[in-house]
Swiss-Prot record:
It is found in: Cell projection, Cilium, Flagellum. Keywords: Cell projection, Cilium, Flagellum, Repeat, TPR repeat. It comes from Giardia intestinalis (strain ATCC 50803 / WB clone C6). This is BBSome complex member BBS4 homolog. The lineage of its organism: Eukaryota, Metamonada, Diplomonadida, Hexamitidae, Giardiinae. TPR repeats lie at residues 28-61, 63-95, 130-163, 164-197, 251-284, 285-318, 320-351, 353-383.
Length: 425
């Protein structure tokens, strides 16, 4: 029977069996099974054709409509997902929970968060699983409802303390809120959960690609939270993340390794990592930033400027704009430096604003320096050292402005005396 072959995971044999069966006649169930096997082989377009043909033979079979909606979702055809799900929801007094879940996910992808939230909550009410609740939490996070998302994720953790994905998602929410201690706890718990699962296996070899997708981010995220304070331990976490992933093609691991080696003053290793990240994804802003950062540390400002220059047109690449401003200033391009550092300062980067103040103090451009000093007072310092430098720079600016004013006043008095002397003569 084709269906038995499908459930056994023998998809090619299942399709061969269906081809034989079709010679004796095509049925709704046969086409449905064909669609399942084709989708399992990632032949999505062919699967859609089979499900549509099955649907024509029996338009009232909900299971075929749901499978068709799944295919459209995998294809990214979200309007069709909504159409299929709505056809079930509108004709059923109590529609299957999966119809609401798919409807909610498709609505979210199309930017209709109100409809997404409505249908995901309906799905959860009909079928209250941890996965459904996690989807609600992710939706809340994407909608900017961080506190609601954190509460939802914590509810899941209370019921399932070792849910690796949820712990990672919760940790990332805390990172966005700059609650790094809470993030560290979440990522640490995720790593412990991973280690427990690995300990249950006969070796460190992972059984499925999905395992590495889940396990690797736990170590990566933990490394991220500690790399500023403990780069050596962070390096170990990144190495584990890379080994669990099974390949070396994750550009973001390489980019983060760059900063670890910079912290360890190993610029040669940092350059290797940054170059690798850039080669893997040259359009990624974090990868460009990592390579530009290393070139600045090496004093190669021309290359840094070249790598970082796309940040000029990016409205949110504040850290890259900060670095680009430094490179521009070192190359004598003070106008470009002012534009870049101003953008970064407007983005809330205290360090970028401080850099602008220091650069234009050194250039004796007190007017521009004063503009950065005004902005600096509005921002929260990112660390005690930058706060100390900021106060010292503002104090120096005041002194220079006073000296300049005194000089101007002295010149004015001197000119007035000369005029009086000329008149007396």
């Amino acid at each position: 029977m084709p269906l038995n072959l499908y459930y056994a995971g023998l998809y090619e044999q299942c399709l061969s069996s269906i081809a034989v069966e079709k010679k004796r006649g095509t049925t709704h169930q046969l086409l449905h099974t064909e669609g399942l096997a084709l989708r399992a082989l990632n032949r999505i377009s062919e699967a859609i054709s089979s499900f549509l043909a099955s649907q024509k033979l029996d338009p009232f079979d909900q299971s075929t409509t749901l499978e068709l909606a799944k295919c459209f979702y995998l294809q990214g055809n979200y309007p069709s997902v909504i159409a299929q799900c709505d056809s079930i929801i509108s004709t059923e007094g109590r529609a299957p929970w999966l119809a609401h879940q798919l409807r909610g996910l498709a609505s979210f992808r199309m930017g209709d968060r109100h409809a997404a939230e409505k249908h995901l909550f309906l799905a959860y009410d009909l079928h209250p699983t941890l996965q459904a609740k996690q989807l609600i939490g992710e939706l809340q996070a994407a909608a900017g409802k961080s506190q609601e998302a954190i509460a939802t994720m914590n509810d899941i953790i209370a019921l399932s303390p070792e849910s690796i994905n949820v712990l990672i998602e919760l940790g990332l929410l805390y990172v966005k809120l700059n609650s790094l201690d809470d993030a560290f706890e979440c990522f640490s718990r995720a790593v412990i959960a991973v280690q427990k699962q690995l300990a249950c296996r006969s070796s460190m070899t992972l059984s499925t690609p999905q395992d590495s997708f889940i396990f690797s981010p736990a170590f990566f995220s933990l490394g991220y939270t500690i790399q500023a304070k403990d780069p050596r331990t962070a390096l170990l976490k990144y190495r584990v993340a890379a080994s669990l992933k099974g390949d070396s093609k994750d550009p973001h691991i390489w980019a983060n390794l760059t900063y670890v080696f910079v912290s360890l003053s190993n610029l040669e290793a940092a350059l290797v990592c940054a170059t690798r990240a850039f080669q893997l994804n040259s359009t990624s802003e974090p990868c460009r930033r990592a390579l530009g950062h290393v070139y600045i540390c090496l004093g190669d400002y021309c290359r840094a400027f070249q790598i970082l220059s796309p940040a000029m047109g990016d409205t949110r690449a504040y850290e890259s704009q900060w670095l680009l401003g430094i490179a521009a200033a070192k190359l004598g391009e003070l106008r470009i430096a002012m534009v870049c550092l101003s953008k970064a300062a407007d983005g809330g980067l205290y360090a970028a604003c401080l850099t602008g103040l220091l650069i234009f103090l050194q250039a004796n451009d007190l007017t521009t320096a004063a503009q950065f000093s005004v902005k600096l007072k509005e921002l929260d310092p990112d660390n005690d050292e930058n706060l100390r430098q900021g106060k010292a720079a503002i104090k120096r600016l005041r002194k220079l402005v006073q000296e300049e004013n005194s000089t101007v006043e002295g010149q004015a008095v001197s000119e007035k005396n000369e005029q009086l002397t000329t008149t007396d003569g």
